[in-house]
């Protein structure tokens, strides 16, 4: 492996500045938990010359609750979010998905932002995020923008992030009354495997109709 430059900014502005400069010079990767990136580097799939570690950015590790509407920082580890009882009471399906990402040790590092940006069709958190109606806040050289989770991916390993952009946080809407969410996956083995099929639901009890489908990217299927 050739020499890799490691940058650890403390603010979003510092991260964006470093990203802008380094991306012009070569291949740059953002590091949150590193559970996917480090494996990709060791296997030779990814060969960055610069790594920007965003774990020291306070805003990206914050969790807030505004009258039932939650904002979760992109670098919040799954194990940390799992300890938020109020969030779990509102969005148990999201936590069900996070608890399926690797071992307890992996969950201590793996983040929502990393699982989303890895853009794997087998990513457990993504269907649950889509079903919840969550949006993602993105920041880059051109400013800030918000995007529905279902619009984030364009294919396996590919996202709608523009050059120099990073994911800042996830915004969850206030849960509707008489609603519930859940996540379930099918795997070849009993433990520690990636999903062959993952399904998330967010149901408001009104009508009794169901629609199903499978797609190479995550798909939202409203019912009537």
Placement of each model-derived feature along the sequence:
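C-terminal structural segment of proteins
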Residues: 1-219, 224
